[in-house]
Amino acid sequence: MNKPTILRLIKYLSISFLSLVIAAIVLGGGVFFYYVSKAPSLSESKLVATTSSKIYDNKNQLIADLGSERRVNAQANDIPTDLVKAIVSIEDHRFFDHRGIDTIRILGAFLRNLQSNSLQGGSTLTQQLIKLTYFSTSTSDQTISRKAQEAWLAIQLEQKATKQEILTYYINKVYMSNGNYGMQTAAQNYYGKDLNNLSLPQLALLAGMPQAPNQYDPYSHPEAAQDRRNLVLSEMKNQGYISAEQYEKAVNTPITDGLQSLKSASNYPAYMDNYLKEVINQVEEETGYNLLTTGMDVYTNVDQEAQKHLWDIYNTDEYVAYPDDELQVASTIVDVSNGKVIAQLGARHQSSNVSFGINQAVETNRDWGSTMKPITDYAPALEYGVYDSTATIVHDEPYNYPGTNTPVYNWDRGYFGNITLQYALQQSRNVPAVETLNKVGLNRAKTFLNGLGIDYPSIHYSNAISSNTTESDKKYGASSEKMAAAYAAFANGGTYYKPMYIHKVVFSDGSEKEFSNVGTRAMKETTAYMMTDMMKTVLTYGTGRNAYLAWLPQAGKTGTSNYTDEEIENHIKTSQFVAPDELFAGYTRKYSMAVWTGYSNRLTPLVGNGLTVAAKVYRSMMTYLSEGSNPEDWNIPEGLYRNGEFVFKNGARSTWNSPAPQQPPSTESSSSSSDSSTSQSSSTTPSTNNSTTTNPNNNTQQSNTTPDQQNQNPQPAQP
């Protein structure tokens, strides 16, 4: 190829490339201006408005007006320089240099996202103010069009307002936890002073809170608040705003320095605090908007009368005789037909001066013990055809966790031999539960649990009798909220509904969003009925007799966790029956309720009558909910038949001598389901047909746990 030809080719390619670049710019510009043409108009009234959100109950009665009760705006001249330096250090280093957007920061965020395969923001302080005022804060709403509008409005605002005005808007707009809106409000209520009278470490604490105000609340989470404050101070030092000496003095100042006793910031009843916290979380999850900083009307599913009655059960001795004031209770009640949470409470004797604090009702940091057996072991076994009747014979005999030499123990260290499935569940025997999970297979059990809203990062055979998980994320494990929703699927015939606290949101522009909860099939109707039929006997003959009400058709399961031998030796030091957690999950045709009881300090044991509180709280609340309602029992569905006290799938044998149908083998289990079904003379006694049954009272090694407790052996290795 000669030189003129090469030059012509280079010229052609250059022109083509330049044309593509120009076309891309024109097209991109066109798309950008299309997006920004739909952006809301800037309004000073919105930037400074004291927005509030009204919350209503399920009868459309006003519960709370959040945002109206505490907001004291700071004037620009009263904002201390150290606060400005702290805010720009942690939020926007180049705030005084950019004009609304920071191209250097955007490029840096882009490169970090490429390197870490994650999403990190490049928003300036001005963009954050725009987001708080006009847009959703949800990550899922970070669309290109939204980002374009946000950037455009930030540029517009920078042209119309000074940097001082923008900072003032921001300082007065942000939520600062405990019902406080704006940093001046927080200064007065946390320290009893105005902003311009606070110390450097106090200002650094306030500057760091807006990104996660409840997480960095110095009253509820002092360690996290101190870490965040010290990060702000470190950034101030790195930016040259404070000296090394100032930094050292500030970081060594206790986080509690100057904090006064927290006063109640709420204009709503104390019994609503836990529920409202979940309303706030669900509104943001479903809409992307924080109702504490965005004005809206929220219609919830709470039954205020039921909520108040639950509060009374917790905080008086009229319904339950509590052993002391320190014993804690957390529970959730859902409507089984739609998943609506009608009541929820996370603690007894809650502090009236903390807003939206820890809600134990949704925490997964305690073990739900044997309440996991119905949903992890037995329901999957019936669903997948491992068992075909409630009279199926299971083995309560010496057994190791599959793939290990670690034995599974019952509470009494004894064995009942061959017993029916119904009796194994009724008496909460551990060995048949673990063996059943092995037959079902870990993967199938995990899939079944997922269908009920419960997940583990990985499932182990110990999860047959425990909800323990190595992850602290609330996504994993069990809580009263999750268990009430899971058990509701038994009550309604097999449909899982996500727990819902809200049913409608009306935004400030008049638009609304309704939330209709569409359920998903979690199990066959036959599975749900067979489980219900077995769990009825838990209340009549088994471990749940403290929840029994003769006039009310209901079903449920007890649960108890326990201490390790080391914990007993070093901390508990008693031969009594003790437990860190006692639980009950149960339901009627209308409501499902799950109850956790224990002490905030796990090493404070439940003893004596304390071990009966969970079932008694459940019984008291179900009495209130069901009295005068003409409660209905469950009807046996097609595909099942009853023989005496047991329920069988069509085609399953119901006598000792008739042939059993073939059971599909588990593809994951190390042992097949070769157990046959039979009837027993009574579900209230072990089978007398088994000559190897042992008397639990003849064992030389006694457990220090209650009759419903499972052993907590070290996590077994997977085979």
Swiss-Prot record:
It catalyses: [GlcNAc-(1->4)-Mur2Ac(oyl-L-Ala-gamma-D-Glu-L-Lys-D-Ala-D-Ala)](n)-di-trans,octa-cis-undecaprenyl diphosphate + beta-D-GlcNAc-(1->4)-Mur2Ac(oyl-L-Ala-gamma-D-Glu-L-Lys-D-Ala-D-Ala)-di-trans,octa-cis-undecaprenyl diphosphate = [GlcNAc-(1->4)-Mur2Ac(oyl-L-Ala-gamma-D-Glu-L-Lys-D-Ala-D-Ala)](n+1)-di-trans,octa-cis-undecaprenyl diphosphate + di-trans,octa-cis-undecaprenyl diphosphate + H(+); Preferential cleavage: (Ac)2-L-Lys-D-Ala-|-D-Ala. Also transpeptidation of peptidyl-alanyl moieties that are N-acyl substituents of D-alanine. Keywords: Antibiotic resistance, Carboxypeptidase, Cell shape, Cell wall biogenesis/degradation, Glycosyltransferase, Hydrolase, Multifunctional enzyme, Peptidoglycan synthesis, Protease, Secreted, Transferase. Its main location: secreted. Residues 297-611 are annotated as: Transpeptidase. Pathway: Cell wall biogenesis; peptidoglycan biosynthesis. The active site is at 91 (proton donor), 370 (acyl-ester intermediate). InterPro entries: Beta-lactam/transpept-like, Glyco_trans_51, Glycosyltr_51/Transpeptidase, Lysozyme-like_dom_sf, PBP_transglycosylase, PCN-bd_Tpept. Its EC number is 2.4.99.28, 3.4.16.4. SUPFAM superfamilies: beta-lactamase/transpeptidase-like, Lysozyme-like. Residues 665-719 have a biased composition (Low complexity). GO terms for cellular component: extracellular region; outer membrane-bounded periplasmic space. Pfam families: Transgly, Transpeptidase. Residues 652-719 are annotated as: Disordered. It is found in: Secreted. GO terms for biological process: cell wall organization; peptidoglycan biosynthetic process; proteolysis; regulation of cell shape; response to antibiotic. GO terms for molecular function: penicillin binding; peptidoglycan glycosyltransferase activity; serine-type D-Ala-D-Ala carboxypeptidase activity. Residues 62-223 are annotated as: Transglycosylase. PANTHER family: BINDING PROTEIN TRANSPEPTIDASE, PUTATIVE-RELATED, PENICILLIN-BINDING PROTEIN 1A. In the N-terminal section; belongs to the glycosyltransferase 51 family. These strains are penicillin-sensitive. Cell wall formation. This is Penicillin-binding protein 1A. It comes from Streptococcus pneumoniae serotype 4 (strain ATCC BAA-334 / TIGR4).
